[in-house]
Amino acid sequence: MTAHGASREATAAARERLDALTDSTSVDVVQLADELAAVTALLDREVSLRRVLTDPAQAAEAKAELAGRLFGSQIGGPATDLVTGMVRSRWSQSRDLVDAVEELADIADLTAAQRAGVLDDVEDELFRFGRIVSSNPALRAALTDRTADKAARSELVHSLLGGRATATTERLVTRLVTTPRGRSLEAGLESLSKLAAERRDRLVAVVTTAVPLSDTQKQRLGAALATLYGRQMHLNIDVDPEVLGGMRVQVGDEVINGSIADRLEDARRRMAS
């Protein structure tokens, strides 16, 4: 097994344990998300601790016992079980463990949204927030200003999303803005959007059109893309008059072009060749 493969398999195993745990409605997933986020922050700060917890020379049970002693009195049983299970696994880099714990925190919050029936809203809100940030350099600068304290950045997010978005979206964005951990805001929002889509095992299609689509058009497009890719598709609709007509669809790294502008560009290329 490669080092990269080791962390990938450890993360996959942790996600399976989280899914099994959250299948029980008795688990408070919002509290679980908070506790996992707190563990993430601690491990991110304490480099020596995370190195000990991921040291392959140390016995798995000894690392699990250490994690249990450190975290057991500070977080609940479900979070402790997840973390101790994770430190039993093999990790290629100590930072991979931190990334995985953070991912579980995000998934727990998304599970709360799914239980509440607002996961679609969260997906749409994350997408729209990303578009707003990308079109407003001053806002982006304020949200990513490392000289501002966390409380100020948290308050800024609340002023933007409080009462306008779901509690889950505000929590996820606040955590990303206050604790970016080296990620750009755009990369963090994209990662959250992908996790949200995965909650329903769906792909995300970013659809750019010259004019807004009707509900019927959205349904037909979603059905056509689902047939094409063999998986349910979530549509993020972006209206851009410069498309001129038709639409542009991006699924992951694949782009499906069907706009007038693209056909004009193709014609220009053929004439120039």
Swiss-Prot record:
Q: Which UniProt keywords apply?
A: ATP synthesis, Cell membrane, CF(1), Hydrogen ion transport, Ion transport, Membrane, Transport
Identify the Gene3D superfamilies for this entry.
N-terminal domain of the delta subunit of the F1F0-ATP synthase
UniProt keyword annotation of Cell membrane present: yes
Compartments it resides in: Cell membrane
How does the record classify its membrane topology?
A: Peripheral membrane protein
> Mind telling me which Pfam families this protein's record contains?
OSCP (PF00213)
Molecular functions per Gene Ontology: proton-transporting ATP synthase activity, rotational mechanism
PROSITE patterns for this protein: ATPASE_DELTA
Q: Identify one Gene Ontology CC term for this UniProt entry.
A: proton-transporting ATP synthase complex
Q: Which family does it belong to?
A: Belongs to the ATPase delta chain family.
What PANTHER family does the record tag this protein with?
ATP SYNTHASE DELTA CHAIN (PTHR11910)
Outline the subunit composition: F-type ATPases have 2 components, F(1) - the catalytic core - and F(0) - the membrane proton channel. F(1) has five subunits: alpha(3), beta(3), gamma(1), delta(1), epsilon(1). F(0) has three main subunits: a(1), b(2) and c(10-14). The alpha and beta chains form an alternating ring which encloses part of the gamma chain. F(1) is attached to F(0) by a central stalk formed by the gamma and epsilon chains, while a peripheral stalk is formed by the delta and b chains.
Tell me the function of this protein.
F(1)F(0) ATP synthase produces ATP from ADP in the presence of a proton or sodium gradient. F-type ATPases consist of two structural domains, F(1) containing the extramembraneous catalytic core and F(0) containing the membrane proton channel, linked together by a central stalk and a peripheral stalk. During catalysis, ATP synthesis in the catalytic domain of F(1) is coupled via a rotary mechanism of the central stalk subunits to proton translocation. This protein is part of the stalk that links CF(0) to CF(1). It either transmits conformational changes from CF(0) to CF(1) or is implicated in proton conduction.
Name of the featured protein: ATP synthase subunit delta
The source organism is Streptomyces avermitilis (strain ATCC 31267 / DSM 46492 / JCM 5070 / NBRC 14893 / NCIMB 12804 / NRRL 8165 / MA-4680)
